[in-house]
Regions:
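Sequence context of c-type cytochrome heme-c attachment sites
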Residues: 2, 32-41, 63, 91-105
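Short, intrinsically disordered, charge-balanced linker/junction segments flanking boundaries
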Residues: 130-132, 137, 160, 169-172, ...
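N-terminal export/targeting leaders of redox proteins
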Residues: 1-46
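Extracytoplasmic low-complexity, Pro/Thr/Ser/Ala/Gly-rich segments
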Residues: 38-73, 77-85, 90
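Detector for the c-type heme attachment site
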Residues: 55, 61-67, 79-80, 88, ...
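Extracytoplasmic electron-transfer domains, predominantly the class I c-type cytochrome c fold
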Residues: 76-124, 172-192
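Electrostatic cytochrome c docking/interface patches
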Residues: 30-52, 69, 125-151, 171
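Sequence/structural segment immediately N-terminal to covalent heme-attachment motifs in c-type
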Residues: 44-60, 84, 141-163, 187-188
Length: 192
């Protein structure tokens, strides 16, 4: 009888031993594997939201994976800044270099634009959306402003006009006026 009761105790103890072993393994795993940060989780969620918008609104021209189709160029490596500019201004370049497509009405919220930008940025490296300290004029001295003016005259005024008023260009293209364009979009257009 003594042997029989020992067997019963062992049989009853097996589930508890298994539970304890699983608990030890789980605790060890949680110590060894670093937890994902809330920033990573938010970025993953933002990319998923961007993919949902992209699949419905962009993939018919740019392909399901941004690889490009005959109606739209590849977006691999264009970066978040390019997407923010295109979607934030409604200005998408023509895919084959013909006359410029007129600007469309901006129909997405900044949150949606940020989500699609994050999704497209996941295709490959490219320019990020700049921080406001990179494009806001606050804190610039007279020398920096003069340098910016010289850069504009050398690189931008031929199309946008000496005062940024825009104008007609060859082959049916048109350079838009820059007066109402947000600083971030001008910065992104220059970088992308």
């Amino acid at each position: 009888m003594n042997t029989e009761s020992k067997r019963k105790r062992r049989a009853n103890a097996r589930p508890w031993v298994l539970v304890m072993a699983l608990l030890v393994v789980g605790l060890a795993y949680s110590v060894v594997v670093p937890p994902s940060s809330s920033a990573e989780t938010e970025m993953t969620q933002q990319i998923e939201e961007g993919k949902a918008i992209f699949d419905v609104s962009c993939s018919s021209c740019h392909g399901l994976n941004g690889e490009g189709l005959s109606a739209g160029p590849s977006l691999i490596g264009v970066g978040a800044a390019s997407v923010d500019f295109q979607m934030g201004t409604g200005r998408m370049p023509a895919s084959r270099g013909e006359a410029q497509i007129p600007a469309r009405e901006v129909i997405y919220s900044q949150e949606q634009i940020d989500a699609v930008s994050a999704y497209v940025a996941s295709f490959g490296p490219g320019p990020d959306i700049p921080k406001s300290s990179q494009y806001e004029p606050e804190g610039l001295n007279a020398e920096q402003i003069a340098r910016g003016g010289a850069l504009f005259r050398a690189n931008c005024s031929a199309c946008h006009g000496i005062v940024g008023g825009g104008g007609a260009m060859p082959e049916g293209k048109h350079a838009p006026a820059l007066g109402d364009t947000e600083n971030v979009h001008i910065y992104e257009a220059v970088r992308t």
